[in-house]
């Protein structure tokens, strides 16, 4: 008799436990849970091409054209791409293409293709008269998707490998490149260090 009563109570508790678990663990509705990897893809860089500036005043120098272009989800490391992106920063478009032409790295050819696309876009969409009258104002790389995959080892073991992707962003500005900055000497660095020490303050005081 007691055993039958316990079995009935156990049978009643299990469904109640399942109902309680489904009600309490459901924090968000299923439609609000994003399982795709497209959330980290922002299109703000391309939208900068649609910025409309106010009309310029008479006698004001002409505002140079700005071209924003990028390529996303490149099967390449963002750190390797950063070195190439930094190399062409501040160069004219012709000089950058010449430097990338003789670079044997995979990312150099990708950046070259992006620069040629941006150059065509400048002439076609941004009223740039001379395609060589452009310089690279900004050039950088960003982190893309990072997919985890299984790497099979011997004796039934395995490891986790990552397939990394990166983004490349470039901004072209009409006109010649700005002159390079004069490198600081040791005396200039010493003066900056002394000025930094003199400008120190004690926090939480009058």
UniProtKB/Swiss-Prot annotation:
Protein name listed in UniProt: Large ribosomal subunit protein uL22m
Disulfide bond entries: none
Subcellular location field: Mitochondrion
GO BP annotations listed: mitochondrial translation
Alphabetized UniProt keyword annotations: Mitochondrion, Ribonucleoprotein, Ribosomal protein, Transit peptide
InterPro entries for this protein: Ribosomal_uL22 (IPR001063), Ribosomal_uL22_bac/org-type (IPR047867), Ribosomal_uL22_sf (IPR036394)
Keyword Cytoplasm found: no
GO terms of molecular function: structural constituent of ribosome
FT transit peptide: 1-40
Family: Belongs to the universal ribosomal protein uL22 family.
Predominant location category: mitochondrion
Gene3D superfamilies cross-referenced by the UniProt entry: Ribosomal protein L22/L17
GO cellular component: mitochondrial inner membrane; mitochondrial large ribosomal subunit; mitochondrion
């Amino acid at each position: 008799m007691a055993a039958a009563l316990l079995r009935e109570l156990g049978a009643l508790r299990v469904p109640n436990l399942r109902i309680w678990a489904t009600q309490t663990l459901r924090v968000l509705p299923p439609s609000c849970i994003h399982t795709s990897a497209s959330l980290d893809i922002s299109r703000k860089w391309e939208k900068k091409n649609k910025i409309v500036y106010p009309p310029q005043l008479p006698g004001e120098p002409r505002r140079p054209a700005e071209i924003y272009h990028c390529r996303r989800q490149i099967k390449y490391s963002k750190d390797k791409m950063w070195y190439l992106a930094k190399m062409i920063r501040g160069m004219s478009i012709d000089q950058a293409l010449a430097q990338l032409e003789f670079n044997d790295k995979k990312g150099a050819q990708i950046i070259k293709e992006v620069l040629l696309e941006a150059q065509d876009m400048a002439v076609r969409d941004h009223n740039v008269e001379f395609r060589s009258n452009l310089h690279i104002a900004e050039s950088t790389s960003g982190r893309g998707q990072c997919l985890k995959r299984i790497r099979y080892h011997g004796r039934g073991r395995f490891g986790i490998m990552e397939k990394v992707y990166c983004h490349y962003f470039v901004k072209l500005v009409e006109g010649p490149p700005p002159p390079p900055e004069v490198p600081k000497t040791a005396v200039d660095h010493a003066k900056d260090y002394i000025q930094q020490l003199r400008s120190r303050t004690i926090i939480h005081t009058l």
